[in-house]
Amino acid sequence: LKPVNVMDQDWVGGGAAGEPATGSSPSLSTRVFDLQAACVHFGHPARAVRALSEVSLQIDAGERVALVGANGCGKSTLLRLLHGLTAPTSGQIHSEAALRQAMLFQKPHLMRLSVQANIALGLWLRGTPWKQAGVQALAALARVGLLALAQRSARQLSGGQQQRVAMARAWALQPQVLLLDEPTASLDPHAKREVESLIEAFASASQAMTLVFASHNLGQVKRLASRVIYLEQGRVLADLPVHDFFSGPLLQQQFPAAHLFVKGELV
């Protein structure tokens, strides 16, 4: 494990550069993330806002981890910390640097280029020859149903279509670690269902992939997650297998705040 590097570009995946994955997948014993008392504060030290407080957790290769909690609880900050876009104010975070990462945000970051070029550029920056990158971009667009729009300007697409382009961009990178920061939060119900279906297809097609995602869709959490982390005011209050998180008695007895959250979200 090596200390994670803070990156300044948040529109493409992190991790190792270059070609699609070959060879064996990482074993389940690989420690992908290791956080020890990680804190993230924003603003002037005298009036700092504590986005994360003393977060300690480990995530291994192949795990499917859902981050849940009310708005402002620290889910997005934790994902950005894992991806290297935010540095800890104190504490430590270690990341398995050899694994390719990709991240999807609530609002996709697309450039004033064609849809195809938005995807191909990320591949090219990682060492894929430009012509090959273009071919791989078209294949990724076909998987999300946008091949016919390959030459359209990405900025002219609807919100749902733009998020599907972001999905295709992540798909093309063939990430071993995928981080999702509520990518359907700003979409209308129809587009939300489309993108959620793509996310579930992506996860199902890549069983060895490590998935960490923030979501208010508890149905999707049940379908995708093997483990649920509940955050409140920047702290981890519950970290349980998905069955235990939704089973009721254990959550209600040991983590009453998380139980009330789940009960409210399911009403």
Language-model features: locations:
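The feature captures the beta-strand-to-loop junction immediately N-terminal to the Walker
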Residues: 68-70
